[in-house]
Amino acid sequence: MIVYEYPFNERIRTLLRLEDLYEKFAFFIGQDHPQHHHVALATMFEMLEVAGRADLKSDLLQELERQKQTLLGFKSNPNVEAEMLDAILFDLDRISAALIASQGKTGQHIRENEWLMSIRGRTIIPGGACEFDLPSYYAWQHDSAEQRLADIHKWFTPLAPLFDAIGMVLRLLRESGRPVKMIAQTGSYQQMLQGKAYQMLRLNIDEALGAIPEISANKYMLWIRFTSQDGDMKPKAFEGDVPFELSLCSF
């Protein structure tokens, strides 16, 4: 099954973009080659670019507190597993405390590092990070893998509380949705949402069908049009019914 996610607002769109960047970053720092570490560093610069567009820290703290208060309301519910609820509440407190303790603007420690900023300025230029452009960076790439990883972890560590908070918020949002089996007649599906404030939808589909969803939505209406891709040809409308699972997620 392939899971497609579609954000209903810019706030969730930003969180999903940052999560995607973090997953790429985590993959590349799990490797040892200098080129992998170059991409990890470039990805970290992209994280700063996306995270710097909004005051994410205060927004995430408010959302974590809202979720905590909501979950506290389930403490007296006998149908809720107390141990699991306590574990989530503990994680919320831990993540919030770490985010509060993180000082200053997101990524300020990197922006104040002139060497890293010189690398960032060259990496946005196609082919701009060659050894004759950045000899000191070229020398760093010839350090041991252990030393490079230690440096990257040192630079990323102040950002970790932000990404822990993003992960928790998106986890709770995803878990709020309940999958419902649907069929798109002749590759098309519409649903009235009656103005309910959803934040995200999740669509599960069997990859063997070869159907690719193109999604558009607002608080009143959801449209899904399935297409198919044949090699390097332009996607075309999918011919036939498409079974899928739809989850509408909201806090």
UniProtKB/Swiss-Prot annotation:
Cellular compartments per GO CC: cell division site; cytoplasm
One Pfam family recorded for the sequence: ZapD
Keywords: Cell cycle, Cell division, Cytoplasm, Septation
Top-rank lineage group of the source organism: Bacteria
UniProt record, GO biological process: division septum assembly; FtsZ-dependent cytokinesis
Stretches assigned to coiled coil: none
Gene3D superfamilies named in the record: YacF-like, YacF-like domains
Primary site of residence: cytoplasm
Compartments where found: Cytoplasm
Protein family: Belongs to the ZapD family.
Protein function: Cell division factor that enhances FtsZ-ring assembly. Directly interacts with FtsZ and promotes bundling of FtsZ protofilaments, with a reduction in FtsZ GTPase activity.
Quaternary structure note: Interacts with FtsZ.
Protein name: Cell division protein ZapD
